Amino acid sequence: MKEELLQLFPTPLLIIPYEQSIDKELEYLKTISYREQQGNGNYRSDDSYLLRNEEFKDIKNFLGEAVNKFTTNVLNSKQRLVITQCWANRNPKGSKHHEHIHPNSIVSGVMYFQINEKLPPIQFAKTNQA
């Protein structure tokens, strides 16, 4: 038998810079309502379908292309995936975002609109789901 390397349960991560202006989207995000999540100071938009709004048309197209690129190049699939939900999170000073999983997702994504360089970057944890 020949030696073989099997990569079981890999976690691919694709990073794609968004080069367009986000001024219009940022202004819109300032006008919508948010609700505190789990008492840790993190706020989530009441609207969980932001990509349905005209203000997010360009971002919707960008994210759709990114998902298709990931599906084709990483998952090696011709199946087109659809983004089902999209919401905004706000984390004021002193707040944190809770660790969580997306068990019903094939692909999950994050897009940062404003980043405070003094804060730690996004963190990922490996969980064993039984």
What role is predicted for each listed range?
Residues 10-12, 82-84, 105-107:
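Residues at beta-strand starts and edge strands
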Residues 6-7, 79, 100, 115:
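Sterically constrained small-residue positions within well-ordered secondary structures
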Residues 88-130:
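Catalytic core of non-heme Fe(II) oxygenases with the double-stranded beta-helix
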